[in-house]
UniProtKB/Swiss-Prot annotation:
Its EC number is 2.4.2.17. Gene3D superfamilies: Periplasmic binding protein-like II. PROSITE patterns: ATP_P_PHORIBOSYLTR. Its main location: cytoplasm. It catalyses: 1-(5-phospho-beta-D-ribosyl)-ATP + diphosphate = 5-phospho-alpha-D-ribose 1-diphosphate + ATP. It comes from Anaeromyxobacter sp. (strain K). Pathway: Amino-acid biosynthesis; L-histidine biosynthesis; L-histidine from 5-phospho-alpha-D-ribose 1-diphosphate: step 1/9. This is ATP phosphoribosyltransferase. GO terms for cellular component: cytoplasm. It comes from the Bacteria. Lacks the C-terminal regulatory region which is replaced by HisZ. It is found in: Cytoplasm.
Length: 221
């Protein structure tokens, strides 16, 4: 059994992904980060029987923790990874946290006059800019971090780029999906230095999770 200093640190995001990833870890290794962390104010919990330490952090920060070596392994949405590319090893699509980054605009809105740059409200500044640039559309990107769906109705933007699971919030705010930008799911990411320092232990972890993902997929079919 590894000592405390030898535990592999896994950064798991708070919220929905914590619950979904916990089911995979429980299937793969018999440990649930959600159960270890719930009922406590601590943001870290050890599972020495599995050789792991789990830390619960904001979803948008997981990639930074792993890239800079504060955690060896993490779970990150593909939207985060493509918005700000990182030097990380991405060995596995976990098949959880499925959503879509979309372009949406008010239902029934008239097309903008030719040559007028659309005002695009979004938290995905890079994804949105690249998407419109690839279409040859000079868009004005307006950075927002919440309540993005109301931006068109308040006259702040002509369209939005946002992430959605069911589209219900979009419809409730009078928006319709115009385009899909990126299909998103959670990815397992690994620090590249850690991969060289602990190749066998990380290989076993990756393969255990790969088997759990395959089993979950087989059950869903």
């Amino acid at each position: 059994m590894p000592g405390t200093s030898e535990l592999i640190t896994v950064a798991v995001p708070k919220g929905r992904l914590l619950q979904e990833s916990s089911a995979l870890f429980e299937r793969a290794l018999g440990v649930s980060p959600r159960k270890l962390l719930e009922g406590t104010r601590k943001l870290a919990a050890d599972a020495p029987e599995a050789g792991l330490r789990f830390i619960s952090i904001r979803a948008g920060d997981v990639a930074s923790y792993v890239e800079h070596g504060a955690a060896e392994v993490g779970i990150v949405g593909l939207d985060v990874l493509r918005e700000e590319p990182r030097d990380l090893y991405e060995p596995l699509d976990l098949g959880i946290g499925r959503c879509t980054v979309i372009v949406a605009r008010p239902k029934g809105a008239r097309p903008l006059p030719r040559g007028v740059a659309p005002r695009v409200a979004t938290k995905y500044l890079s994804l949105a800019a690249r998407h419109f640039a690839a279409k040859g559309v000079p868009a004005e990107i307006i950075p927002l971090h919440g309540s993005i769906e109301v931006a068109p109705s308040l006259g702040l933007a002509d369209t939005i780029v946002d992430i959605t699971e069911t589209g219900e919030t979009l419809r409730a705010n009078g928006l319709v999906i115009e385009e899909k930008v990126l299909e998103v799911s959670a990815r397992l990411v690994v620090n590249r230095v850690a991969l060289k320092l602990h190749p066998e232990r990380l290989r076993r972890l990756i393969e255990a999770l790969r088997a759990a993902v395959a089993a979950a997929g087989a059950e869903a079919r």
